[in-house]
């Protein structure tokens, strides 16, 4: 309602672990043309120096069964669930909701990942320049926004769902950033 009409180019960026906050954020926009409203999900890429991650969609995992549902999973060749690693407890999960598998397979949403280091850098930038205190989950989404913003036209609007407060991440932030 602020714009009186939907702008022509919008990027809706959300972190994706299990996927409920992303789908809730995107659900009103699913039927819009993807050239007008792009849905971008950002998974936990884990530490840069580790092979472990929690990014089954963006790291081309295979379909498997977890909790009775078929979805892309971090798994080994025998179908056993792999360990995952992420600075963000809320994103440290080996699977994703089947709705995100559908959105990926139909190319309605694009999925990527941010490393722990990317998320920490984004957290610091957002905290300093926007006076927000995002949790580590949306810091992954902010990392993607920071990465793509310089390449976008000036009429493109980026909206990041900041779906959590850093109070719960206080100990991790103190350990990693000395704050």
What does each model-identified segment do?
Residues 127-161:
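C-terminal structured "cap/appendage" subdomains that terminate the fold
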